[in-house]
Curated annotation (Swiss-Prot):
Any one Gene Ontology cellular component term annotated for this protein: extracellular space
First-listed, main subcellular location of the protein, grouped into a coarse class: secreted
Residue ranges of the TM segments: none
Keywords in alphabetical order: Glycoprotein, Protease inhibitor, Secreted, Serine protease inhibitor, Signal
GO MF annotations, alphabetized: serine-type endopeptidase inhibitor activity
Locations listed in the record: Secreted
Coiled coil: none
Site location (Reactive bond): R381, S382
Family, per entry: Belongs to the serpin family.
Protein name in UniProt: Serine proteinase inhibitor 2.4
Stored PROSITE patterns: SERPIN
Domain of life: Eukaryota
Length: 418
């Protein structure tokens, strides 16, 4: 069982801040109104490739700023939140956001980008009973602020946004209200999203994604044992190491990049790609991350019998402020006094003050549902030397994707499972 949750937060206010909604609560629009489309959405594969490009660009910046640390984030959560902000932007502010998300505006009209996101989010919401994927946008708005009706309608119809009013003059009460909401929506996995509120906050945009999946071939918790995980050539830590024998699963050995790629499938429409660089080669693999690399790995996967597969049981959580990272990707003006977010309220006195992203990734034999391993028998045979062993006992990468829309839900690097 794997559980993953991520939250993206945009702090907003007048001068130091961003979005707003009128008084009252706006519910999610559950229907996808195809008959109201006046354009053509970006097709799923094109959007997936663009999102992958953004995901790897963001990953490289995070890895640069957080060397030798665990990394986990949801590129889809971040890109969807930025796309929503772009609905309120104009001129250079708008161009920077969409180009920072890796869209070519000479090839793809702005309206088509949002239709593509709407279709993607709708497809992800159609998860089956064996998997759980919840992705949603919620806005908490200062009760005295008003926004343009056109912006309000676009956010609602394109991104199914749910909005609430809050009194940010009572900062502690507003923070508790938001934290309680997030705790409930993530089933208690994110306990405290906000530790404080930026001064003069007028809006908090929360974009969250929650994924819970069962392995098609679960690990047997009875054979999970403490084992060495090598942080580098000189240091190691003891971690709970899961094991599975006689597993047939998609596998590819990339000799060019000196890494092994193993795909483990979830029941339903999701899979996890584990990339294990050879000792000392993780930086080489990270530098090569681009849509073409991921496509090569996926196209090269072939069913392979692995006699022994070892994978650490781990829980990784991260907390990022993304303003500097996004600025490195060209998204700068929205954080400055020059920001033009006049499609939100009709004035230019808004800017984004803070972008916070929290994510949690848990990989285990099974989750809270004991049925994950029901009916699965493992045969342990003695007296035979395994012909192939894959041991994730050093830093590795993990890509969780939705196979139906070919989009990356989560991207992670595990440098220390503890």
């Amino acid at each position: 069982m794997a559980f993953i949750a991520a939250l993206g937060i945009f702090m907003a206010g007048i001068c130091p801040a961003v979005l707003c909604f009128p008084n009252g609560t706006l519910g999610r629009d559950t229907a996808v109104q195809e008959d109201q489309d006046n354009g053509t959405q970006v097709d799923s594969l094109t959007l997936a490739s663009i999102n992958t490009d953004f995901a790897f660009s963001l990953y490289k910046e995070l890895a640069l700023k957080n060397p030798d640390k665990n990394i986990v984030f949801s590129p889809l959560s971040i890109s969807a939140a930025l796309a929503i902000v772009s609905l309120g932007a104009k001129c250079n502010t708008l161009q920077e956001i969409l180009e920072g998300l890796k869209f070519n505006l000479t090839e793809t009209p702005e309206a088509d980008i949002h239709l593509g996101f709407r279709h993607l989010l709708h497809m992800l919401s159609q998860s089956g009973k064996e998997e759980q994927i919840n992705i949603a946008v919620s806005m908490f708005i200062e009760k005295h602020l008003q926004i343009l009706a056109e912006f309000q309608e676009k956010v609602r119809s394109l991104y199914q946004a749910e909005a609430f009013t809050a009194d940010f003059q009572q900062a502690d009460e507003a923070r508790k209200f938001i934290n309680d909401y997030v705790r409930k929506e993530t089933q208690g996995k994110i306990q405290e999203l906000l530790s404080d509120l930026v001064e003069r906050t007028s809006m908090v945009l929360v974009n969250y994604i929650y994924f819970k999946g069962k392995w098609k071939m679960p690990f047997d918790p009875r054979v999970t044992l403490k084992s060495e995980f090598y942080l580098d050539e000189k240091r190691s830590v003891k971690v709970p190491m899961m094991k599975i024998e006689d597993l047939t699963t998609p596998y590819f050995r990339d000799e060019e990049l000196s890494c092994s790629v193993v795909e483990l499938k979830y029941i339903g429409n999701a899979s996890a790609l584990f990339i294990l660089p050879d000792q000392g080669r993780i930086e080489q693999v990270e530098a090569s991350l681009q849509p073409e690399t991921l496509r090569k790995w996926k196209d090269s996967l072939r069913p392979r019998k692995i006699d022994l597969l070892y994978l650490p049981k781990f829980l990784v959580s991260t907390d990022y402020s993304l303003e500097d990272v996004l600025s490195e990707l060209g998204i700068k003006e929205v954080f400055s006094a020059q920001a033009d977010l006049s499609r939100v309220t009709g004035t230019k006195d808004l800017s984004v003050s803070q972008v916070v992203h929290k994510a949690m990734l848990e990989v285990a034999e099974k989750g809270t549902e004991a049925a994950a391993a029901t009916g699965v028998k493992f045969v342990f045979r003695s007296g035979r030397v395994p012909t192939m062993t894959v041991r994730f006992d050093r830093p590795f990468l993990m890509v969780v994707s939705h196979t139906g829309v070919e989009s990356i839900l989560f991207l992670a690097k595990v440098t220390n499972p503890n």
